[in-house]
Design a protein with these regions (language model features):
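Active-site nucleotide/adenylate-binding loops and adjacent lid/helix of ATP-dependent enzymes
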Residues: 1-58, 69-73, 99-111, 115
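Peripheral (often C-terminal) accessory segments that flank ATP-dependent C-N-forming ligase machineries
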Residues: 4-7, 167-202
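Short polybasic/polar patches that bind polyanions
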Residues: 9, 118, 158
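A residue-level signal for beta-strand positions that form part of recognition/binding surfaces
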Residues: 14, 49, 76, 183-188
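Pocket-edge structural micro-motifs
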Residues: 19, 32, 54, 78-81, ...
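Short, charged, surface-exposed secondary-structure boundary motifs
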Residues: 25-27, 87-88, 200-201
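Phosphate-binding core of ATP-grasp and ATP-grasp-like enzymes
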Residues: 44-49, 55-99, 107-139, 144-153, ...
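ATP-dependent carboxylate-activation loops
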Residues: 146-167
Length: 202
C-alpha cells in the first residue's frame, strides 16, 4: 500500500491502475480522487502487480495488430478501431462492444507499431498493441503478445480473406511462403446475454 501512495504522490490524480497481466479492462481501476484510491486498496489482493499510469481523457482507441515470424519479421499487420473504450464498456453495461478493421492505416501508426514490435524483439507470436489516438498523434497504452480478444481473429480473417491461425501454423513449422492479403473493412458487434434487442442475430 505504501507503493500505491508513492505512485499517487509522484504521478498525481487522476490515474489508471492496471494489472500487469490481463485482457481488456478487467480488474482495471480509474482513480479520480482519494476515495477511489482507498477503494482500490481495499479491493487489491496484495499480490497482483499493478501499473499506475496518468489517466488520458480520450475516447479514441486504435490498435496495431499482427504476427511476427521466427526471425522477428512482421508477416502481416492490421488495425482495429474501437467504437467504445474497454474501460467505458467495463463501467457502463448499457454499451455493446463494437469495433472495425481499418483498411487504410495511418503511416504514423504503422511506424509506431513497427518500432514497438522491434523494441520487444518477440518471435513467432501474434501482437496486439493499443494506442490512444489524439488529434495529430498517438499515445501507447499497452503491448500484448497475443491477438486481440473475443472475435478479433474472425474479423481479421473476414476482412483479409484468409485464415490467420493457418498462417501462424505455417510460420511456426517453417512452411510460410508469404501472404497475399485482400484488404477490406471488417466489423464486429457483440451482444450482452442479459439484454433484449429489437432485432435478432438473423
Amino acid at each position: 500500500e505504501g507503493d500505491i501512495e508513492k505512485g499517487v504522490k509522484k504521478l498525481k490524480l487522476p490515474l489508471i491502475a492496471k494489472p500487469d497481466n490481463g485482457v481488456g479492462a478487467s480488474a482495471t481501476y480509474k482513480l479520480k480522487d482519494k476515495k477511489d484510491v482507498e477503494n482500490f486498496k481495499k479491493e487489491w489482493d496484495g499480490t497482483t502487480h499493478y501499473f499506475l499510469e496518468p489517466f488520458v481523457d480520450n475516447s479514441d482507441i486504435v490498435t496495431f495488430d499482427g504476427l511476427v515470424d521466427a526471425k522477428g519479421n512482421i508477416v502481416f499487420y492490421t488495425s482495429i478501431v474501437y467504437y467504445h473504450t474497454p474501460l467505458d464498456l467495463l463501467n457502463n453495461n448499457t454499451l455493446d462492444w463494437v469495433y472495425y478493421i481499418d483498411k487504410d492505416l495511418d503511416p504514423k501508426l504503422v511506424e509506431y507499431g513497427k518500432n514497438s514490435v522491434k523494441a520487444f524483439g518477440m518471435k513467432e507470436r501474434f501482437f496486439h498493441i493499443e494506442f490512444f489516438k489524439t488529434k495529430d498523434d498517438y499515445i501507447a497504452i499497452e503491448y500484448n503478445n497475443r491477438p486481440a480478444g473475443a472475435f478479433a481473429v474472425d474479423v481479421y480473417n473476414f476482412a483479409h480473406s484468409t485464415d490467420y491461425f493457418r498462417v501462424y501454423a505455417e510460420v511456426a513449422n517453417g512452411t510460410f511462403n508469404g501472404l497475399n492479403v485482400d484488404e477490406k473493412y471488417g466489423l464486429a458487434s457483440t451482444r450482452r446475454d442479459y439484454k433484449d434487442y429489437v432485432h435478432s442475430d438473423e
